[in-house]
Regions:
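Structural motif
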Residues: 6-8, 15, 124-125, 189, ...
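Conserved phosphate-binding/catalytic region of the ribokinase-like
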Residues: 2-8, 147-151, 204-280
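Short secondary-structure boundary/capping elements
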Residues: 32-39, 107-112, 172-175
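Conserved beta-alpha-beta core of the PfkB/ribokinase-like small-molecule kinase fold
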Residues: 130-211, 228-229
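General beta-strand structural signal in soluble alpha/beta enzymes
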Residues: 9-10, 79, 157-158, 191-192, ...
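Glycine-rich phosphate/adenosyl-contacting loop at the front of the ribokinase-like
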Residues: 1-75, 276-280
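Conserved N-terminal subdomain of the carbohydrate kinase-like
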Residues: 50-130
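A short, aliphatic-rich alpha-helical micro-motif
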Residues: 119-121, 183-184, 215
Length: 280
């Protein structure tokens, strides 16, 4: 059953170019769609969800290629913006080496005033990751979207999908760890891996990290670990032993299920262990 509500995926969309040879010697590249928002939106659409992308691309061939790819994957691109003055971001990758061109690009310059008023409706969801939280207008668009979604009664979900290498680090700028930790308590649902847990809190011990995680607005935490996937509310716990899912697919699967059940921020604290066990 396809949920009647929309999962809005906010963040960055870029064109990734992969090479087999080291970047300094590469003569050809394979293009693919990249960026957290694009990956999350595609994962939601693949789960049968109604996924809509909130992002800005350049009014250029790369931007239109990305939009066409997303539309072909079943993602609603009607709310995307296109800039005539800023290009689509590019990411070159080869054998673990990455070189990004993103600082003065359309994606990171997606500003709060470009969000449509009244976009979110009760029963919708806002899903976002961390790469768009570096110091840019896009960071403040995330804050504005979180406020708008909460005011509308929509669920909010933060799946950081941390890639610190993608964060420019000018002197004096907040680090990925600091900004991510600041945003965690503003989301109703948080999804982390063991590696992210250790990066953010200095420990892989989930019982220790749960105390700083289950605070603020956060009512549900999903942890993807080697032994399986855990779900925690402030009172209950569910576990799927041996289950392994990439973070975007895990977030998409959980959100699609919660929307099918007409979950709201107010209902999350009341989820029983049996109900939790049905979200994956």
């Amino acid at each position: 059953m396809v949920p009647k509500h929309t999962i809005y995926c906010l963040g960055e969309v870029l064109l990734a170019l992969d090479a087999d040879a080291p970047l300094a010697h590469a003569e050809s590249f394979r293009p693919r769609l990249g960026g957290d928002a694009a990956v999350l939106a595609q994962a939601c659409a693949a789960q049968g969800g109604r996924a809509s992308l909130l992002a800005q691309l350049g009014e250029d061939p790369f931007g239109h290629r990305a939009a066409s790819t997303l539309a072909a994957a079943g993602v609603d691109t009607a709310h995307m913006r296109f800039s005539r003055t800023l290009p689509t971001a590019l990411l070159f990758e080869a054998g673990g080496e990455a070189l990004s061109y993103r600082v003065r690009t359309a994606g990171l310059q997606f500003a709060p005033e470009q969000l449509e008023p009244g976009l979110f409706q009760p029963g919708d969801a806002l899903l976002f990751a961390s790469s768009g939280l570096c110091d840019s207008p896009l960071r403040y668009t995330h804050l504005a979207a979180l406020t708008a979604a909460r005011d509308a009664g929509a669920l909010t979900c933060f799946a950081p999908c941390l890639e610190p290498a993608l964060w420019p680090q000018p002197e004096g700028e907040s680090t990925p760890r600091e900004v991510t930790r600041q945003l965690l308590p503003r989301a109703d649902i948080v999804l982390l891996t063991t590696e992210e847990l250790e990066f953010l809190f200095g420990t892989a011990e989930m019982r220790v990290a749960l105390f700083p995680l289950l605070r603020g607005h956060t009512q549900l935490v999903l942890l993807a670990r080697a032994e399986g996937i855990h779900a925690f509310t402030r009172t209950n716990h569910a576990f799927w032993p041996g289950l392994s899912l990439p973070a975007p697919r895990l977030a998409a699967k959980a959100l699609c299920c919660l929307l099918q059940k007409n979950s709201t921020p107010e209902k999350l604290p009341r989820l029983t262990t049996r109900q939790l066990q049905t979200i994956l």
